[in-house]
């Protein structure tokens, strides 16, 4: 049985921080796998592990075709061969197939060889079709790839990649993704994209990635094959990429090229290093230029690795803070083609919206005109318009325009910064209930405000803002200080359950989870049997059984589609259970 787990821990935009475990070894995603050429080690795998790289990737075809490497790998295993105790993924020779037109191994042979040498994540011999290939070639290559996928599925004994191919034809990418999602694979790389990145065709890259993502199961990590330059990490993660790999850290170093988060510079152009990594802190550009070629290459490779690691950490911190779109916006300014790709990504509104959290740890900053097209903004406008039909009184907001007055305390309207200030006004006497009802309509959908029509709202003595919401002596909900949205109490959940028809805001769990949910224990994904497809990440939800009996209320990390598909990790962080 394959030892493989992937669960989501945090998210922003369509990006996610995940926990990936293979054969008892765990890495946090997004993660990058430095490419290791076993014939030429500029930085050793052991050094990479010490630098914090918990995964590496190497080429099983090179090992297979090199007698001394093959014999040793079969004798001691790939981990001892490379002196690396982290997760080792291997390619199959597909890159050589794309570059040189052929390989001397069959699909079955390379899959079996990968198992024999003890790799953690294997790859079958797919056919990478380059961009702009004739449609007929792309279709035929994909047909062969899917045939080989079926063969690999039958014989595999390890976790395995199933690469999505289809050249630059979005419909073929989506078709391939759906077909592979039906098979028993663990990770889905998006293949044959290196030529797009090498020619700065980032806009086309966005089309390829999104076409693939819409067809893939959301519970499997997605790997952007050959992507390893830090300037694209933020954009790629915002699209939903979990894994990267690249030999660029070494290839660029050999060519005296110096990576930065905004692009690449030639060593000869630099008078100062804009970096404080161990290499840049110790040496000047002039000192590196005067070094022997081999030593200079190694030090530049180490610098490039530090920049890669630093940018991935920056992306993850942005996810934690709800600032990923802001980082994407910033990085997009580093190259006109990247900026075009950013604008192209924002056109995929439906895909982006379903993955976008309903609330964030940080305020919305209008940092550009593109920020007004971020999914959190467009969703807020659409929901506000719905609320406006019931609460027509409006106020003018410098970013969002005319908004319902009774949403003015809530995210993102109150928690936003633009060129002009927006002053949040305290509720006037007797109006606090309208704020609660309007927010319920905004947060839970049409009709939800009825659950609070007789509510008494306690105001904070310090701020004058709504806080505790009660009715007939019972606690219904809390009006959260941080984002002006509602956290449900038991009585509030019961009322919402009554006014919202099934399946609205429901997460349905099986019989095994019912007693635990009632006791206020968290709900894990494997126990979810159904969910409202309109649920979005970080929504407050109603946990029910198959008979629609209310069991608990809590906050979900997943959207409705993910709740129905994920089998690992947390589904609902239960706040309160409903005892029988």
From Swiss-Prot:
| Cofactor mode of binding and number, as noted | Binds 1 zinc ion per subunit.
GO terms of biological process kind: tRNA wobble guanine modification
Q: Where is the active site?
A: 91
Instruction: Report whether tRNA processing shows up as a keyword of the record.
Output: yes
Residue ranges occupied by any PUA domain in the UniProt entry: 504-579
GO terms under cellular component = cytoplasm
List the EC numbers from the record.
Answer: 2.4.2.48
**What cofactors are annotated for this protein?**
Zn(2+)
Q: Which segment of the chain is annotated as a signal peptide?
A: none
Q: Indicate yes or no for the key word Transferase.
A: yes
The disruption phenotype is: Temperature sensitive growth at 85 but not 93 degrees Celsius.
Which residues are listed for substrate binding in this entry?
Answer: 126, 192
Q: In which pathway does it act?
A: tRNA modification; archaeosine-tRNA biosynthesis
Q: Which of UniProt's keywords are assigned here?
A: Glycosyltransferase, Metal-binding, Transferase, tRNA processing, Zinc
Protein family according to the UniProt entry: Belongs to the archaeosine tRNA-ribosyltransferase family.
The protein's job, in short, is:
Exchanges the guanine residue with 7-cyano-7-deazaguanine (preQ0) at position 15 in the dihydrouridine loop (D-loop) of archaeal tRNAs.
Please give the name of this protein.
Answer: tRNA-guanine(15) transglycosylase
Which organism encodes this protein? Thermococcus kodakarensis (strain ATCC BAA-918 / JCM 12380 / KOD1) (Pyrococcus kodakaraensis (strain KOD1))
Gene name, please? tgtA
């Amino acid at each position: 049985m394959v030892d493989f787990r992937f669960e989501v821990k945090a998210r922003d935009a369509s990006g996610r921080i995940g926990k990936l475990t293979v054969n008892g070894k765990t890495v946090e995603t997004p993660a990058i796998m430095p490419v290791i050429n076993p014939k030429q080690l500029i930085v050793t795998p052991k050094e990479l592990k010490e630098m914090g790289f918990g995964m590496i990737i190497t080429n099983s075809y090179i090992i297979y075709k090199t007698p001394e490497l093959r014999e040793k790998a079969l004798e001691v295993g790939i981990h001892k061969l490379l002196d690396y105790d982290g997760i080792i993924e291997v390619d199959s020779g597909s890159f050589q197939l794309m570059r040189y037109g052929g390989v001397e191994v069959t699909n079955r042979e390379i899959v079996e060889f990968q198992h024999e040498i003890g790799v953690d994540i294997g790859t079958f011999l797919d056919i990478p079709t380059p961009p702009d290939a004739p449609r007929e070639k792309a279709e035929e290559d994909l047909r062969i790839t899917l045939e080989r996928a079926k063969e690999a599925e039958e014989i595999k004994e390890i976790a395995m990649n199933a690469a999505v191919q289809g050249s630059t034809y979005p419909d073929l990418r989506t078709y391939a993704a759906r077909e592979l999602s039906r098979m028993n694979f663990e990770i889905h790389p998006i293949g044959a994209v290196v030529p797009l990145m090498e020619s700065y065709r980032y806009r086309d890259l966005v089309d390829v990635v999104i076409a693939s993502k819409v067809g893939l199961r959301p519970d499997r990590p997605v790997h952007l094959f050959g992507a390893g330059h830090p300037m694209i990490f933020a954009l790629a993660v915002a699209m939903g990429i979990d894994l990267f790999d690249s030999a660029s850290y070494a290839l660029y170093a050999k060519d005296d090229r110096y990576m930065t988060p905004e692009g690449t510079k030639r060593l000869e152009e630099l008078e100062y290093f804009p970096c404080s990594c161990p290499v840049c802190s110790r040496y000047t550009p002039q000192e590196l230029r005067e070094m022997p070629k081999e030593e200079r290459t190694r030090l530049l490779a180490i610098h490039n690795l530090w920049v890669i690691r630093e940018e991935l950490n920056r992306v993850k911190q942005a996810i934690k803070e709800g600032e990923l779109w802001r980082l994407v916006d910033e990085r997009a300014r580093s190259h006109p083609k990247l900026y075009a790709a950013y604008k192209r990504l924002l056109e995929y509104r439906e895909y982006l919206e379903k993955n976008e959290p309903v609330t964030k740890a940080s305020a919305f900053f209008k940092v550009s005109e593109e920020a007004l097209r971020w999914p959190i903004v467009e969703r807020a406008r659409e929901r506000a318009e719905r609320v406006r039909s019931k609460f027509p009184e409006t106020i003018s907001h410098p970013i969002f325009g005319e908004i319902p007055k009774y949403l003015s305390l809530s995210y993102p309207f109150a928690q936003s910064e633009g060129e002009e200030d927006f002053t949040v006004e305290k509720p006037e006497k007797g109006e606090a209930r309208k704020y609660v009802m309007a927010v319920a309509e905004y947060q839970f959908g049409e009709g939800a405000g009825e659950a609070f029509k007789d509510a008494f709202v306690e105001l904070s003595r310090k701020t004058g803002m709504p806080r505790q919401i009660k009715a007939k002596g019972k606690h219904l909900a809390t009006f959260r200080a941080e984002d002006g949205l509602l956290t449900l109490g038991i009585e509030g959940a019961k009322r919402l359950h009554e006014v919202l028809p099934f399946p609205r805001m429901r997460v349905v769990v099986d019989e095994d989870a019912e007693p635990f949910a009632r006791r206020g224990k968290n709900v894990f994904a494997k126990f979810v049997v159904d969910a409202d497809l309109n649920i979005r990440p970080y929504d407050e939800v109603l946990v029910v059984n198959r008979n629609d009996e209310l069991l608990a209320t809590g906050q979900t990390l997943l959207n409705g589609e993910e709740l129905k598909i994920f089998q690992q990790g947390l589904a609902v962080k239960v706040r309160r259970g409903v005892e029988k």
